[in-house]
């Protein structure tokens, strides 16, 4: 019986702390007049930018070689 009361007391304490943190966060948001800031994560943004840059560069290079090959075959100068 004592261990059950003890565990319920711990759960109540943790719930109270969690609730008070949520209330503080909500109050802090209300002080900012409801402005929501968007935070970008650095690693994923960096990876996304790098893949786009590599994709554009490879696309241009492959496009040039493909066009040169087609022009060569059309003019029979290969």
Swiss-Prot record:
Residues 23-39 form a propeptide. Its main location: secreted. Disulfide bonds join 72-78. InterPro entries: Antimicrobial_frog_2 (IPR012521), Frog_antimicrobial_propeptide (IPR004275). It is found in: Secreted. Pfam families: Antimicrobial_2, FSAP_sig_propep. GO terms for biological process: defense response to Gram-negative bacterium; defense response to Gram-positive bacterium. The keyword Cell division does not apply. The keyword Disulfide bond applies. Residues 1-22 form the signal peptide. One of its GO terms (cellular component) is extracellular region. Antimicrobial peptide. This is Lividin-4. It comes from Odorrana livida.
């Amino acid at each position: 019986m004592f261990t059950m009361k003890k565990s319920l007391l711990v759960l109540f304490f943790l719930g109270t702390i969690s609730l008070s943190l949520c209330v503080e966060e909500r109050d802090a948001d209300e002080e900012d007049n409801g402005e929501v800031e968007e935070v970008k994560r650095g690693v994923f943004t960096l990876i996304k930018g790098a893949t786009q840059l590599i994709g554009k560069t490879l696309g241009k290079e492959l496009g040039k070689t493909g066009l040169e090959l087609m022009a060569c075959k059309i003019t029979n100068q290969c």
